[in-house]
Structures are given as C-alpha cells and as structure tokens.
C-alpha cells in the first residue's frame, strides 16, 4: 500500500544537462541544444519514469562571463521555452511542462496568453516558473542600462502575478456556449474586463484565450531570498530551492510552510522541491568515479566564471587557494550568493574549491551512490520534512537520466514512495493541487 506522503519529482534540465562539462562526457549529446529529437527522447523517458514535470530554465541574455569561459559553455544558446514546450506537449500525454518567464522583462498580457495557450495545447499540463531575472545583462537587451533593483523587481513581480492570474480569469469556464441556432458564440455576462491600473502595470483585458483547463497553470517560484520566500508563500504552488544538506532543507521547509499558515493558505498547497544532483552507480565508489571523471572535464576558467555569476562578483583576481573574502552586495541573486558565502565559511573552503563545486553540481544537494542509498536519502528528506519531493538534476544526458529512471525510480516504487501510474490527467491533479476558483464568476 502506498504511503500517505508520496515524493513529487520534477526534472531540472538544460539541453546538455546542468553540469558545466556534461556535453564532454562520453556518450553525451553535445548538440542537444538545438536537436528536437533529443528533447523528445528526454521527455518521453521522464514520462516513462512517471515524473511529475519537466522544468525548463531560461535566460534572456548570454551569461555574464569572460570569453575564455563563455566559449566553453554549452548553455550559451537554447530554444525559447514557450516555443519548445508546445511541441513537447504533442509527444507526451501526462508529463507536466514548466517554462520560465521573467516578470521584469516581459509584459503580463503576453505571458498570460502564452501559458493559457500551452495549457490548452497540453490538455492541462502547463506550469509557469515566475522569475524576476538575476542576470544583469538581460537589462541591456530590453532598453535599460542597468538591471532593475532587487526589491523593485519583486514588487513588480507581485503585481505582475495579480495581473496574469486576473487575465486567466477573464472568462467563466462555461462562457463559450457556441449556440449554432441562435448564433451566439459566448455569453457576454461571463466575460470580465480586468482594467488593471497599478504602480507598475496598466492592462485592460480581457484575455483573448479561454480560461486554462487547470483554471490557472501551476505557479512555480524559485527564489530563496527573503523577498522570494514571501512571494512564494503568497502565490506559489511549487517552489524550487537549493539547500545542500538536510538541516538547511528542513529550516527552509518550515519557514515557507509557516509563512503560508500565517497567510491562511494550506501548507499542502505548496510543494517544496529542492534541487538534487544525482549520480547513480552499481557501488558508491563507481558513482563517485563518474562524478570525478565529470569534474575533471571542467576547465578552471569555467568554474571561476560560474562562481562569479552565482556571487554576482568577479572572483578571477582573488587568491584561488585562499579563503573567500568578504563579497560586496550586488543586484544579482541574493539567495545564491548567501548560500555560497555561508558554505565557504562553514566548511573552510578555498575559492578554488568553491569554484569546483559550483562548476560541477550547480551548488545543489549531491546524491551520489547506488539506487538503494539514493532512495534512502530521498526517503529521509521526505519523512523528516526537508521536502515534498525533488527537482532532479542529471549529471549528463541521456545516460544520467536513463540511470535514474531505470534504477532509482523502481527502488522508490518498491518502497511505496513514488507512483506507479499517474493519478490524474492534469499537472495539478498529479501534484495534488486544487483547481483555483475564478475570482470573478
């Protein structure tokens, strides 16, 4: 009999995987960025493994790295998520499809329309990852000289969310009567004009897409700063975070769920999915050897550049074999910066060691071992309220994905921790989330 609490599994995937050197690993697909057949194979494998969702991160600029590091990066280019995911919807039936869209460098009408369309095309499997953009270079692609200040980005994001969800509620679920005899296509009493005028946004509406199948696509958030946690507690239904140990995971889980209670939201209406970088082997030693080989393929310039991006500060001129000095505040991601600073101080890491870590597993929790040891750790996190599931990162593709689906998933199922079949038809139903009521009808 299945346990009362079941793991939720998302897949955090970039075309050639998360690890900086994944594209160089033996058997990897180095051309995956623009090879649709590879994406099709990835999502169909995820669906075979009964994953809840495929999550596609996105940036609206090339990463802010020196050219000696940038030229080694396989993530410099990728498909636009909201162009790719509708195509992937056609080759899948159950897998949720979550795309990133920035609230800083988009307009809410565009976002509402695209995600509503994706939800209809996928028969109710869309999710919106709400981000405020951490890459300062994005500003220069949208007519700005400087990135919008962190607090201002989150204030705009809160209003942006209200507008987008309001636009999704433009129509009652039964507005489109399509009466052939009378010639009436929709009931005019069941259309709402939003007419929003706020601090940052002015949007009239209504949306020219029917209400999404799920009511709203699932709302996802990934910020772990104070502002990010509060926004998640108020609005999110899934949150991605990146603690690298159970204690930090439990602390984050309790904090966000506690904020929800204070806001009158059910704690079950938000799923906390920390990132987990998973390497599978027949033995722990074999799994570690895979990780060691992968890490050996990371050029030092790439590791230093990745660390600089995460800290929002160029560390290339620092003593690489010395401790991380005090790093000034920046307008990049505050949660990523703070996590790495805390880790460096706590574990007495040198700048070089920290760069190797970030360039390898993206600063996430590492689960390196056999199917049994990995399942044991996942079970402990779930049972001790460190998470509701995981946003799994694969070390290389397709091999790392195949290892997880073919070896770890059966062990999780054997322990009655994970589904054998999908429970519902929509992403909300599979995540155990309610369908939002229309606020206007």
Where are these regions (language model features)?
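N-terminal beta1-alpha1-beta2 module of alpha/beta enzyme domains
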Residues: 1-91, 214-217, 340, 441
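Acidic (Asp/Glu)-rich catalytic clusters
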Residues: 2-4, 47-48, 85-93, 119-125, ...
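An alpha-helical appendage that flanks or caps ligand/catalytic pockets
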Residues: 2-18, 151-214, 247-254, 258-380, ...
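Hydrophobic faces of well-ordered beta-strands that scaffold small-molecule active sites
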Residues: 7-11, 54-56, 95-101, 124-130, ...
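Conserved, mostly hydrophobic/aromatic
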Residues: 9, 46, 50, 88, ...
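Hydrophobic, small-residue-rich alpha-helical packing segments that form membrane-like cores
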Residues: 10-13, 28-37, 74, 84-97, ...
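Active-site mouth loops of central-metabolism enzymes
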Residues: 22-37, 100-109, 145-147, 213-226, ...
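Alpha-helix-loop-beta-strand connector modules within alpha/beta enzyme cores
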Residues: 69-97, 261-263, 401-420
